[in-house]
Each structure stands twice: as structure tokens, then as C-alpha cells.
Amino acid sequence: MFLFAGLGNPGPKYAGNRHNIGFMAVDAIVRRHRLSPWRRRFQGAVSEGEIAGEKVLALLPETFMNESGRAVAEAAKFYKIPLENIFVFHDELDLPPAKIRVKKGGGNAGHNGLRSITAQCGNDYWRVRLGIGHPGDKSLVHSYVLNDFGKAEREWVEAVNTACADFAPALIGGKAEDFQNRAHLFLEAQGFTDVKPLGGARAS
């Protein structure tokens, strides 16, 4: 069994925030692969079904970002899901907008959701890093991630979510690099090759 966890904050107030792109991506996967309706369990919203012939649990923790690990750990423990079968979809300041990278293990890059999961579960889970760019100054990060995507950003956000949904079977099949490459080619074909964060700030 596999666990796809999207990171974000619960409730309509945060639904459109840049910090919630992980929620958006996992919701797109659930819709694309017709998993079950969302229900409340494991301190979050869950949906179940099959992707590429394997059982998948989708989870959106409702603990708020800083406590995401509680929900992920509870679900993983209940279903005995090993770390190598856990994929965490999250916003990534250190990637330009519309870039997707996948890696197993590594640091948390200041991301409180990842920090919580690592503390609760260990480090060797997969991160699906969804680039949102950087506002240009550390002092601006908090307001940047907790603001909604602007109208000019919505096309690439939708394309990123589509890529995650369409190519999710590659993650299930143990082909993380293939997922990343196919997502890159898809986003490139859509014209999202050099997207800048709103305001022209850096995206390193």
C-alpha cells in the first residue's frame, strides 16, 4: 500500500494559499484516478482506491502544517505503510514556479510540515517538491506562502496539479525519475519554462 500525503492548512481561509499546493496536487490525483469520496480519519481527510493496480491512501492532514506528522504517522502505522511507500507533496520555495522535483530523504529546508513528519516518522520518505518560487527576502516568506496564488499564477498551478495526477502511476511503479522527467516535459510543452514569482522576485 502507498500513502500520498498533501501538505497544507485546513479550511477555506487557507484553501488558495501557496502553502497549500500540496493539498491541491493530492486532490487532483484523487479526482483523476477516481478514488473514494473524502472522509475524516487519521486527523485528516482521507480517500482510498487503486492506482496502477496498487492500493493507495490519500491523506490531507487537518492538524495545521506544523503538526502534519501526527496525521501521517497515524495513517502509516495503522496500515503498516513503510517509509519508502510514502510520498509527501509540498510547496518548495527553493524551486522556481512550475518546477517539480522528487527526492527520497534529505533535509527539511525550513519546511515545518516536513520537519513534523520527519520527527514523527523518520526521514526516508519521498518528497514531491512543487516549486512556488521565493519572494526574494527571508522576511517576506511567511506572508508569501500564506497568501493566495494570484490570477497570473493559476494556469501554471493547474498544470502542475495535472502533471501530478497524470503521472502519479510512475511513482507507484517505482519510477520517481520517470515521473519527474514526464512532468518536466509536460510543463515545458505548456510553456511554463521560465516562470517568475509574482513581483519579479528571485526563484533560486
From Swiss-Prot:
Matching InterPro entries, A to Z?
A: Pept_tRNA_hydro (IPR001328), Pept_tRNA_hydro_CS (IPR018171), Pept_tRNA_hydro_sf (IPR036416)
Q: Where does tRNA bind?
A: 14, 64, 66, 112
Q: Where is this site: Discriminates between blocked and unblocked aminoacyl-tRNA?
A: 9
Question: Which Gene3D superfamilies does the UniProt record give?
Answer: Peptidyl-tRNA hydrolase (3.40.50.1470)
Q: Where is this site: Stabilizes the basic form of H active site to accept a proton?
A: 91
The UniProt entry's GO CC annotations, sorted and at most eight, read: cytoplasm
- Please give the Pfam families that the UniProt record associates with this protein: Pept_tRNA_hydro
State whether keyword Kinase applies.
no
Question: Which SUPFAM superfamilies does this UniProt record tie to the protein?
Answer: Peptidyl-tRNA hydrolase-like
**Gene Ontology biological process terms, A to Z:** protein quality control for misfolded or incompletely synthesized proteins; rescue of stalled ribosome
The active site lies at 19
Which subcellular locations apply to this protein?
Answer: Cytoplasm
Chief location category: cytoplasm
GO MF terms listed in the record are: peptidyl-tRNA hydrolase activity; tRNA binding
Q: Please give the catalytic activity noted in the UniProt record.
A: an N-acyl-L-alpha-aminoacyl-tRNA + H2O = an N-acyl-L-amino acid + a tRNA + H(+)
Q: What is its EC number?
A: 3.1.1.29
Tell me the keywords, alphabetical order. Answer: Cytoplasm, Hydrolase, RNA-binding, tRNA-binding
Q: How does it assemble?
A: Monomer.
The text of the family note is: Belongs to the PTH family.
Q: Which named protein is this?
A: Peptidyl-tRNA hydrolase
Q: What is the lineage of its organism?
A: Bacteria, Pseudomonadati, Pseudomonadota, Alphaproteobacteria, Hyphomicrobiales
